[in-house]
Amino acid sequence: MCKNCLLKYVFLLCAFLTSCALSAQTIIDLGAGGSVRARGANEQDISVSAWRTSADSAEWRDCMVRGFNALSRDSLAEAEKLFQRALTLFPDAASAVVVRHNLGRISMARADYAEAVKVFTEILKVHPERHEVRFDRATCYLEQGNARLARADMDVLMAASPTSLDRKELLFLRAAISMKERLYRAAKADLEEVLRLSPENVSASLLLSIADEKDGRPQEALDRLNVLLQAHPEEVQALVLRADLEAGFGRFEAARVDYDTAIRLAPEQADLYVRRASVLLRCGAKGAARKDLDEAVRRGIPRSALLSLYEEL
């Protein structure tokens, strides 16, 4: 029998039992010397309660399955509604913490970090050992710009060395917190550990080059990007970072080549046209620069934000 048919059957039975009068019904006693006797009112209540619990359990399971399916489709509103219904059915169940955690993650996905922090904090008051929840709260704090509270949660996590979390994820988050606090060497230490654990990790290499540049080491950042692009010549972020550094060194033709490649690989990124237009102006190619600025406007960047560049044409 399919799940939906079973649910319909359970609910029909529950409705029937609820509507029945509490007057005597026939029940078979299967105990020793079994006999036929009348069902009492108390037994009727117990039977109805059992059916209701069964129906609620079936609905709860259905809500959870459909909720996670909705999450996989990025249908946040649908998932939220289903998880909230599951909580209403069994608010004190051991699994309720998982439901609440996912509701908090839905708020995270909506960039409603204040609501997510509220949900995660309520969970951690009762379950301080829930490392995934603490990790998500630290992430929210960082998104809110509160590096101090993010650091406090991260210190707890690093001290616990949780096996439920990937160490690389912890190192990435701590590096991001250090970057926010302008502790660039601390950030680099964590990112270098990520590379020791995962030598081909492109994100760690990119972030290391950014940390080098922020730490006043632009040549080291450029060298790192050169190595990365030898292995990954079509990594758009690396191309853009290298072009930015080359432009900073006054190597505008080299920067232009990298922007050309980046735009070929990711033509939908409007900001790339603005970056290339700035370099084209330095190269004296005003006609090409105008085309790039117009393309950036066509792709959604407000013309008012580009007035200073238009004035250079």
Give the predicted meaning of each segment.
Residues 72-73, 106-109, 143-144, 176, ...:
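Register position in tetratricopeptide repeats
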Residues 89-92, 126, 160-163, 197, ...:
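Structural marker of alpha-solenoid helical repeat scaffolds
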Residues 59-89, 105, 109, 176:
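Alpha-helical segment of the N-proximal tetratricopeptide repeat
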Residues 60, 94-97, 131-132, 164-169, ...:
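Helix-start (N-cap) detector for alpha-helical repeat units in TPR-like alpha-solenoids
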Residues 65, 98-102, 136, 173, ...:
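Canonical tetratricopeptide repeat
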